[in-house]
Structures are given as C-alpha cells and as structure tokens.
Amino acid sequence: MEYVLETNALIKSYRGYTALGGLDMRVPRGAVYGLVGRNGAGKTTLIRIICGLQAPTGGGYTLYGVKNTDRAIRKSRRRIGAVVEMPSIYSDMTAEENIRMQYRVLGVPSYDGAAGLLRLVGLDGTGKKKVRNFSLGMRQRLGIAVALAGDPDLLVLDEPVNGLDPQGIIEMRELILKLNRERGITVLISSHILDELSRLATHYGFIDGGRMVKEISAEELERAARKCMSLRVSDTVPLVPVLDRLGAEYTVISGNEVKLYTPMPVCVLSDELSGVGCRLLNVTEQDESLESFYMELLGGERHA
C-alpha cells in the first residue's frame, strides 16, 4: 500500500507540555482519513506540523516519500491544500477575488481556473457578494476552493463541519466525497463529530494524549463491530456489581448507560436489578458504531 503521509515517533513539546508524544501514523493514498480524538489530544498540532506551520521537537515524517528534514519537503508541501482552524479568506472580497488572490500567492499565471473552482464548491452564483455576507457553510466551502487553487493531491481539513447547520453539513459531506471519488484527492479530516465522520472516512486514526492509539480501516471497523444491548438505567453504580457477578462483558459509557455484549434475557436482568434498587429505563439492540468503538477505545471502561 502506498502512503502519502507517514509520521515516525513525532514529538512536539512546549514549555512543560507535550502535545505529541511519539506519534506514528500512515495515511494511504486515495483515502479519506478521519483523525479522531478528544479536544487537546494533539490533532490540530499534528496538522499544523504537517502543513509546515510548526516544526516538530523530535521524530519526523515523510510526505510523498520526502522526509521533513529534506530540502525538497517544500516541494512536497505544495501538493497539500489545507483549511486549518478557520479558512484563510478575505471578508471584504468576493469569492472569485479570494481565489484570484490565492493564485497570485502561489504564482499561478492564469485565473482561468477560478470559475471552475467556484462551480465545484457550489459558489458560482455568488457574483459580487462580499464574503462578509456569506453563511458559515459558504465560508467553509470557499476555504476549500482556496485550498484547491494549487491543484493539491492531499486536502487537510481541521473540523470542517464545526458550527454548520444540517444543510451545511450535508453540502460539506457531498463536496468532500466528490473531491475524493471524482478527483482522486486524498483527504485528511480532523473532527469530533463522529457520526458525520463515519459517513465519510475510509480509514481512521484514534489519538489520545498525543499518541496514536489505533489505526483501522472502515472495513476492519465494520468487521470488528458486534451486536450489543444499550442499557439505560437510573444509576450504573449498583448495575456494575450485578454484571460482574453474572460474568458479563460490558462497557460503561456514562453514569446511566452501559453497552452489554453478553447475550442476556431482559427479564433476568430486570429481576437482578430490581433487587439492588436499580431501575432499567430502556433497552435497545444495536451494532457497535464509530462512537461506541471510540468510547470503548478511549473513553469507556471495558469489563470482561
């Protein structure tokens, strides 16, 4: 498998704080790679290093086979388009003027591609409308159009649907999928909206505390998903000893929710709980989702 990006024991430290603590990561060519982690896990720091906005303290990475210490890394970085944190756009310009400005920055001799980029992101009808009058979703799509001005092979997006309304989220999803499937652009997405990420990603990287906990493909995740029962109870504190006594495998999700992986008649469970003063509020059968996999991997306490 060919990888467009590989990190090797990547470290980024600040005064008294380590943002990345030896992170290893591999992004396959043509993938939509979802970077998953809590706020403060190191996602944005990683993206800023990849884009050349920060330098690593230790370790390294390769981008299209070129090491970050090689002088040729600047040429490899030109194959990246990125929207990090907020789109780098000018609010007193039109959408087309923003793209033309990026062409000038990149040294592109012709503006002929501007109209095509606006059509691609669904902003071709904005005309003379200033960006300050755009919705957040329109601004995000313009940010992607600006990132595409250099005709990149890798698109890096930091929280691209954050703050968008449902329609804006749908439009962003369709755009990302179009860029990946029709143009063959590899996409690296950092997001905490796991349900939306599960509709996009072909591969996932779960990071916590500045380290890679697990990398897995969407197909592997689907195979690993198991049926379970989601139990909502009045309090998980009295529930846990009951499940331990019954030899059940489970994950505590919150103070009133548990994922139960061991098949068990609801009537038996209800009787057991009534004896310890715990009320069973709701039971639903479900397959493990990206969210439950994440909770099990990083956020929940697993028992077996």
Task: Identify the role of each PLM range.
Residues 173-261:
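ABC transporter nucleotide-binding domain
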Residues 8-10, 23, 251, 283:
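Generic beta-strand hydrophobic packing signal
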Residues 2-5, 12-189, 194-208, 212-214:
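ABC transporter nucleotide-binding domains
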Residues 227-297, 304:
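Short, charged/small-residue-rich alpha-helical element at the C-terminal edge
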Residues 1-3, 300-304:
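Short, Lys/Arg-enriched, disordered terminal segments
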Residues 29, 125, 142, 235, ...:
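Non-catalytic surface loops within mature trypsin-like serine protease
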